[in-house]
Design a protein with these regions (language model features):
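Extended amphipathic ligand-handling, pore-lining, and cofactor/metal-binding catalytic surfaces
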Residues: 1-314
Length: 314
C-alpha cells in the first residue's frame, strides 16, 4: 500500500498572521481524521515555500490541493512551476474556468507522483461551507427562511474566474430554495457590495465573502463599504443596522471549519483513499461550530499582493 500525502498550498502573508491560520486549522482537522499518512502545508509568502514543500513529504503519492478561491495566476502558473510538475499544461485540467478537478504529473526532482487538484473555491461542496458560515454567524442551524444571502468576491478586473466562482455558488445556493433571496455581489464592479441594501427586499441579510482568509478586504474594506462602521478599527455590530436592514457579516468563508471537508473532497475526487473522513469531518465541524469569529481587530494586511488578489480571495 503506497503512502499517500495531502499537501495544502496557500498564499500566506509576511505581514498578516491571520492569512495562514485557516490553512493550519484545516490541516489539523484533516490530520485528526487520520486518512492521510502525512498532511503538509506550503505557502507563497511563508515557510515552507511551494518550492520546498514536496521535500518535506515522504509519501510517493501526493495530493496537492490549492487553498485558493479561483483558477488563475497562482493555480495555473505559480504553483505548477514551483512544484516542478513535469509537462504541466493548462489543457490537462480541461477547465472552463471553474471546472478543474485534477491532473496527474511526476515531480521528477523528488520522484513523486503529484495529483494536482483544482482550487477549493470552485468545488461544489464550497456552497455548503457558505451556508454553514451563514449558520455560524447567525447562530441559527436552520437559517434561511426570511433571510437573504449575499456572496461577495472581487470583480472580474483582476481575474475573470474569480467572479465566475462567486456567481457559481450564488446560483447553486439559490437553487437550494433555502434563503429568501441570494445575490452575488462584488467589490469593484456592479452589483457592488457598497450598495448591498439596494439589492434585497428581505430585512435580514447575511453577507459571506468568498475569501480563504481574513485580511484587509474582509476586515477593513467590506465592513466600511457596507456602512457597518465608519472605521474598521472600532469594530461593528453583528447584526448591524443599515438603511432599514440587519446585516449579519460573516467574515471570510475559508475560516469556517467545514472548509476542511472541501480539501478532503478535492483529494478524493483525484483518487485519494479517504475512508469515511468526509462524513467524520462534516460531523465534527458541525459540533465544533465556527473557528472564524467575526472580529474587527485582525489587523491590516498591507501586503496587498495584487496578483494573489482575486484568487486567494485577498
Amino acid at each position: 500500500n503506497r503512502m499517500q500525502a495531502l499537501v495544502i498550498v496557500a498564499h500566506g502573508s509576511h505581514l498578516n498572521p491571520d492569512a495562514s491560520t485557516p490553512t493550519y486549522d484545516h490541516a489539523d482537522t484533516i490530520r485528526e481524521a487520520g486518512v492521510f499518512d502525512e498532511v503538509r502545508t506550503g505557502f507563497w509568502k511563508e515557510e515552507p515555500s511551494f518550492r520546498e514543500v514536496l521535500r518535506t513529504v515522504e509519501s510517493d503519492e501526493v495530493y496537492v490541493v490549492p487553498l485558493f478561491i479561483s483558477e488563475g495566476y497562482f493555480t495555473e502558473e505559480v504553483i505548477p512551476r514551483e512544484l516542478r510538475l513535469e509537462g504541466w499544461d493548462l489543457e490537462a485540467w480541461d477547465s472552463d474556468g471553474t471546472s478543474a478537478t485534477h491532473a496527474t504529473f511526476e515531480a521528477a526532482d523528488v520522484e513523486k507522483t503529484v495529483h494536482y487538484c483544482g482550487p477549493v473555491g470552485t468545488h461544489d461542496a464550497m456552497s455548503d461551507v457558505i451556508v454553514r458560515r451563514a449558520e455560524s454567524v447567525t447562530g441559527a442551524p436552520e437559517v434561511g427562511e426570511g433571510v437573504a444571502l449575499a456572496v461577495v468576491g472581487h470583480g472580474t478586473e483582476r481575474n475573470e474566474n474569480s467572479a465566475k466562482a462567486v456567481e457559481l455558488h450564488a446560483d447553486r445556493i439559490d437553487a437550494m430554495d433555502r434563503f429568501e433571496e441570494v445575490e452575488a455581489l462584488f467589490m469593484d464592479e456592479d452589483p457592488e457590495v457598497d450598495d448591498v441594501t439596494e439589492f434585497f427586499e428581505t430585512e435580514d441579510i447575511v453577507v459571506v465573502p468568498l475569501f480563504v482568509a481574513d485580511g484587509y478586504h474582509t476586515q477593513e474594506d467590506i465592513p466600511e463599504d457596507m456602512g457597518l462602521t465608519e472605521d474598521y478599527r472600532t469594530g461593528w455590530e453583528t447584526p448591524a443596522e443599515v438603511e432599514g436592514h440587519r446585516i449579519w457579516y460573516a467574515g471570510a468563508v475559508g475560516t469556517e471549519a467545514l472548509t476542511a471537508d472541501v480539501l478532503i473532497e478535492r483529494a478524493a475526487d483525484a483518487g485519494a483513499d479517504v475512508g469515511d473522513a468526509i462524513e467524520e469531518v462534516r460531523r465534527k465541524t458541525r459540533t465544533a461550530g465556527t473557528n472564524g469569529d467575526v472580529d474587527a481587530d485582525s489587523g491590516a494586511d498591507a501586503d496587498a499582493d495584487a496578483d494573489a488578489g482575486a484568487e486567494a480571495g485577498d
